Amino acid sequence: MPVLVMSVLAALPPLPPLPPLPAEPFTLPPYFDYGATFLWALSGALLGARRGYAIPGILAVAFVSSVGGGVLRDGLFLQNGPPVVLRSGGYLLLIALATLLILIAGARIQRQRHLPQILALVDAVGLGAYAVVGMNLALAAGLSLPAVVLVGVVNAVGGGILRDVLMRREPSMFLPGTLEESLALLGCLLFVALVKGLAINQLLGAWITIAVITVLRLLAIRFGISSKPLHGFREYCERQEP
């Protein structure tokens, strides 16, 4: 039977490759890109400081929190030379500055009343924005549509995954509660549907995707919308909690 199945599969004609989407340029405004990098580095440095890490540890957490997704995108998937964050000194300078601020005035910064709201807003906008940037670069590299979606999701949430692994925590995307990864995937699928399915201009589709994901993320934060464990395993999950 296995031989027969393999013979039938071998006789089938190869599937045609998926046509790539038009790779029109889409880039984030530099002030947003640098601003988001700085704030995410600040957030990562705060986490490292709260864990009691030494200066190298705080700097490492700040680095992966802010640009880890881009490093994974360029180094693992696109492989088109050194990652962008290493070709421009501005990113590393901002990460170092954020770490220095935490070392000097970390206790005062974390007491700022509006810091969580600012970080939540940047996170909401950046979730869709960096997903779109990752997909655009994947399109320019000629990747298939499933690969384009994968690169977009990794670019959006890869930094958080690396941060959790580095800090020996379960990645948040594996746990119920957060919707970041689900919304990033939804945004990538929405972008592909708009541009490929509805033939919308790629730049317009990018901004629509960013707007939709930003609104959904802010609504989830505002109303406490979260994911849940699978129904049949909820009791088991509760028993395993420390």
Where are these regions (language model features)?
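Loop-to-transmembrane alpha-helix initiation sites
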Residues: S88-L92, S144-V149, P176-L185, A199-I210
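Cytoplasmic-side transmembrane-helix entry/capping segments in multi-pass membrane proteins
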Residues: P56-V64, S88-L93, H114-G126, V151, ...
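Structural signature of hydrophobic alpha-helical transmembrane segments
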Residues: E24-T37, P83-L97, S144-V157
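The first (N-terminal) embedded transmembrane alpha-helix
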Residues: P30-S43, V61-V64, G187
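C-terminal ends of transmembrane helices
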Residues: L42-R51, D74, L101-P116, I161-S172, ...
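Small-residue-rich segments of transmembrane alpha-helices in multi-pass membrane proteins
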Residues: A62-G70, A120-N136, L179-V192, C237-P242
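Short, structured motif recognition centered on aromatic/hydrophobic residues
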Residues: A60-V64, V71-F77, L150, V154, ...
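Short, strongly hydrophobic alpha-helical membrane anchors
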Residues: M1-L28
